[in-house]
């Protein structure tokens, strides 16, 4: 099976895709928004949490993802001193190099979160790795299965926030409900925030 990249298509072609049916039939016909359209939809209502996704891959195709992202933010006065206060911006990436690049480009600085999967665990979820990360990031976003109280404590000791992923009702592991699972991570392990597909089930502090 051939692997396709976004850069293989024009925006007009991408806009023909059905982006909603895979999630729920009631969203059939939903179109893929551009980043600009997402900004216009969310401005003044909620924050933005963009991810530089596979930036090294697209870099080989001639796309400077970090430069394009920063240009879009500045064009919309986001992440600047003139920014809409109800639309804070946090940038996430699995790429340490991408965050390092962004750290040098952003003025004023924005929160930068290094996402961490199982393969990255031994490199970054250690006291030494966390201290190194502090040089270019403000937080970690690990897969939820990688966290325990000690890992959260070490990250906080290094001055990093902790935002695990992804909490959804279809995958709650040992917990009966996603609400119970989110409550455990928030109020037992002490994470600062979390990524969830079910914000409507977000638990309140007991």
Annotated model-derived regions:
Residues 1-124, 128-131, 135-137, 142-147, ...:
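Metal-dependent phosphodiesterase/phospholipase catalytic core, i.e.
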Residues 137, 190-191, 199:
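A structural motif
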Residues 150:
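Short glycine/proline-centered loop/turn elements that form peptide/ligand docking sites
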Residues 199-206:
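C-terminal helical cap(s) of enzyme catalytic domains, especially alpha/beta-barrels
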């Amino acid at each position: 099976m051939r692997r396709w990249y976004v850069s293989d298509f024009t925006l007009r072609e991408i806009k023909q895709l059905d982006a909603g049916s895979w999630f729920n039939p009631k969203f059939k016909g939903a179109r893929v928004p551009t980043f600009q359209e997402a900004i216009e939809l969310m401005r003044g209502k909620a924050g933005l949490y963009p991810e530089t996704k596979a930036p090294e891959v697209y870099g080989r195709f001639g796309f400077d993802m970090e430069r394009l992202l920063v240009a879009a933010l500045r064009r919309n006065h986001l992440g600047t001193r003139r920014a809409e206060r109800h639309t804070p911006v946090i940038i996430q990436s699995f790429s340490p190099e991408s965050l390092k690049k962004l750290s040098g480009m952003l003025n004023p600085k924005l929160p930068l979160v290094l996402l961490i999967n199982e393969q990255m665990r031994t490199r970054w979820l250690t006291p030494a790795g966390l201290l190194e990360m502090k040089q270019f990031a403000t937080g970690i976003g690990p897969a939820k299965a990688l966290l325990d109280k000690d890992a959260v404590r070490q990250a906080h000791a290094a001055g990093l926030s902790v935002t695990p992923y992804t909490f959804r009702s279809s995958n709650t592991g040992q917990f009966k409900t996603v609400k119970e699972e989110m409550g455990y991570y928030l109020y037992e392990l002490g994470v600062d925030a979390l990524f969830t597909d079910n914000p409507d089930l977000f638990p309140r502090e007991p």
